[in-house]
Design a protein with these regions (language model features):
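N-terminal small-domain helix-loop-helix segment of the aminotransferase-like
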Residues: 1-57, 62
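Short hydrophobic alpha-helical segments of the AMP-binding
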Residues: 32, 87-88, 150
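Catalytic P-loop NTPase motifs of RecA-like helicase/translocase cores
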Residues: 59, 83, 165-166
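Conserved PLP-anchoring active-site segment centered on the Schiff-base-forming lysine
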Residues: 66-88
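Short beta->alpha connector loops at strand-helix junctions that form conserved
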Residues: 78, 97-102
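A short helix-loop-beta submotif of the ANL/AMP-binding
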Residues: 90-96
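Active-site phosphate-binding strand-loop segment of PLP-dependent enzymes
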Residues: 100-171
Length: 172
């Protein structure tokens, strides 16, 4: 049987009329600031912390809607995780696909296609790493080359880095 204190806590929470995310307490913020310092070596002040509502895709959608307006061109490498391109089309933005190409046993960016499309008025690029569905962890050189294309064409990059603390196969 379940301990009475657990049953009581569940009943108390279930009686609350809102089932959404609760208010974050100070220990949560302390843990985030501690992790950022320990893992990444930088200190963040409490007043500089801002947390998005539930989930990365929701947050990326909000950012996309703030940075663009309906009809703006948004590029997404394809294939890709459905919610990343769905947020573009459902928000009335123009989806511009840039294909990933199979080369030397793995997917990589088609830089020529990326460059041509970025120069055609793309406002935002949506990225993810590791890439979903291919699983590719982009090499530093690939990211730097892609960012140069977008910097040159004044494109904003929105990147899903939800797995940034997970290091795969020697990648950093």
């Amino acid at each position: 049987a379940c301990a009475p204190c657990i049953v009581e806590a569940v009943q108390k929470r279930a009686a609350h009329p809102v089932y959404g995310y609760g208010v974050r307490q100070q220990p949560y913020y302390d843990a985030v600031m501690g992790w950022l310092k320990k893992r990444h070596g930088f200190e963040v002040k409490y007043e500089h912390l801002a947390f998005a509502p539930p989930g990365v895709i929701y947050a990326m959608n909000v950012v996309l809607r703030i940075l663009t307006k309906p009809g703006d061109r948004v590029m997404v490498p394809m294939p890709n995780y459905d919610p990343l391109f769905d947020m573009v089309t459902r928000g009335g933005r123009k989806l511009v696909e840039t294909p990933l190409v199979w080369k030397d046993g793995r997917y990589t960016f088609d830089f020529a296609d990326m460059e041509a499309k970025a120069a055609s008025g793309v406002k935002v690029l949506v990225l993810s790493s590791p890439h979903n569905p291919t699983g590719r962890v982009w090499e530093r050189e690939e990211i730097e080359k892609a960012m140069e294309v977008y910097r040159k064409n004044q494109c904003i990059v929105i990147s899903d880095e939800i797995w940034s603390d997970l290091t795969l196969n020697g990648h950093k």
